[in-house]
Amino acid sequence: MTLLDSDSRQSAEVLPAAGPAPDRPRTYQVRTFGCQMNMHDSERIAGLLEAAGYVRAADDEPADVVVFNTCAVRENADNRLYGNLGLLLPVKKAKPDMQIAVGGCLAQKDKGDIVRRAPWVDVVFGTHNIEALPVLLERARIAREAQVEIREALEVFPSTLPSRRESVYAAWVAISVGCNNTCTFCIVPSLRGRERDRRPGDILREIQTLVADGVLEVTLLGQNVNSYGVDFGDRQAFAKLLRACGTIDGLERVRFTSPHPRDFTDDVIAAMAETPNVMPQLHMPLQSGSDAVLRRMRRSYRKEKYLDIISRVRSAIPDAAITTDIIVGFPGETEDDFAETLDVVRKARFAGAFTFQYSKRPGTPAAEMPDQVPPDVVADRFARLVALVEQIALEENQAQVGRVVEVLVAEGEGRKDAETHRMSGRAPDNRLVHFRATDARPGDVVTVAVTQAAPHCLIADQVLGVRRTRAGDAWEARRSVRPSGVLLGMPALRPRT
C-alpha cells in the first residue's frame, strides 16, 4: 500500500485506461452517497474517467471500475460503504481485473483504514485530489497493490475538471468549497477544509457555457453560500453573484444551497426578490429551535433571529417555499428544548424539512458531550416532529390547489410515473409536481393547474400547455447519441516530477 501526503508532487496527468481486452474500453460506475456537493464531485469523477478513455457501464452489466464517492456526516455512512464493499467482494473474486476506488469525505477521514478493513479496495483518494483518480487506478493496476493518496489541502478546484453531467437541463455549480464554521456536530470542515471561493468571473463563465449546452437551471453550491466572498474580501459578493446570474440570456432558473442564518443579510433577500430568474425558494437549516441547544451546537444565531429572517424573506417574496434541516436528540436536549423546535416549525410553516436523529460522529466536539439523549427518547421525538412537519407540509401544499404553475420536466423524479401515466418535474418554488403525461420531454416546460396535494408533492391533472425548449432538444440529442463526456474547463494539472 502506498500512502502519499500533501507534500507529494506526483503527476495528475490523465492516462489512457488499460484493460484486459484491447478491443474494449474499460467501463466505470460511480456510486454517490451524501450531499449535493458530492453529486457535483461525482460528475467530475465521471468526466475524468471518460477523458481517460473509460465508458459508462450499462445498468445491467458489472463495471470494470466502481467508484464510491462517500459521505461522513452520519454513522450509517460507514455502514453503507462497508456493506456495499462487502457485496462487491465475490464479484471481484470472479472478475480479478475489476478495480474498486473509494473517495469523498469518509475516505478523507479514514484514509488507509479503508484498505485495512476492505483489502480488496484498489484506490483511496480524498476530497482534495479527485483529479488524481485516473493515475491512481493505473498505478494500482500496474503495481498490483492498493494506492492511498490523501492530501490535506485543495490544489485543483473540482469545477475546473471535465464533467459528465447527469442532467442536460439542470446543473450544479460550485461557488466555494470548505467551511469556516465550527458546528460541534459536524465533521465536514475538517474533511473539506476552510472555505475557498471561486472568482465571480469564473463562475459566470461556467454558467454561460452550461446555458450554451442547453441548461435552463443552475443550483449554486457551497457549504455556506452566503458567506461567499470572504476569501477575497467582499461581503456582498453573493448578492452580486445572484444579480449577475439574472443577466445571463437563456438561464431561466437559479437556485442555491445551503445558506447559514448567521450570514443571511438583507442584500441577499433583495437580490432574490429583484432578480427574476432567482426562484422563490429557500432552504435554510434550522437544526434546533432551542437557544440552549443552538449554543451547544455553536450555531451562532438564535431562534428569534431565524424567525426574523423567515419573516423578511416572506415579506419580500410572498410565494417563497421555505424548507429546512432539523436535528433531534442533540446531547443535552430536554423536552422543553424539543418543544421550542416544534414551536419554530409551527411558526415558520416549512414547505418541507429534512429531519435527522442525532448521530454521534467521532472527532466532533458533540461526540464527547455529556447528557447524550437515550435512543428511545430520540425516536419518540423524531416521530412527533415528522408528524408535525408532514401535517404542515400537507396544509401548505393544499393551499396550492387551483394555482397555475410552470413545471420544468424532469427525468426520474417520479418513481410511479409509469404506472400512474404521469410525468414529473419541479415548480419554480421547487415543489415536486406529478402531471398527466404529455409529449413533453425532460427539459421542456409545461404549464399545469394543480388539482391535488400530498405532503411531499402536488398533482396536476390539467395540462394547459407545453413549451419545447433547447434543453429538451439537448436531452433528445443525448438520448440518440450518448456523448463520451462534457468538458466545462481544462483540468489544471500538475507537471510530472
From Swiss-Prot:
InterPro entries: Elp3/MiaA/NifB-like_rSAM, Methylthiotransferase, Methylthiotransferase_CS, Methylthiotransferase_N, Methylthiotransferase_N_sf, MiaB_methiolase, rSAM, rSAM_horseshoe. It comes from the Bacteria. [4Fe-4S] cluster 2 binds at C179, C183, C186. Transmembrane segments: none annotated. Its main location: cytoplasm. Residues 1-10 have a biased composition (Basic and acidic residues). Keywords: 4Fe-4S, Cytoplasm, Iron, Iron-sulfur, Metal-binding, S-adenosyl-L-methionine, Transferase, tRNA processing. Its cofactor is [4Fe-4S] cluster. Binds 2 [4Fe-4S] clusters. One cluster is coordinated with 3 cysteines and an exchangeable S-adenosyl-L-methionine. Residues 1-26 are annotated as: Disordered. NCBIfam families: miaB-methiolase (TIGR01574), MiaB/RimO family radical SAM methylthiotransferase (TIGR00089). Belongs to the methylthiotransferase family. MiaB subfamily. This is tRNA-2-methylthio-N(6)-dimethylallyladenosine synthase. It comes from Acidothermus cellulolyticus (strain ATCC 43068 / DSM 8971 / 11B). The gene is miaB.
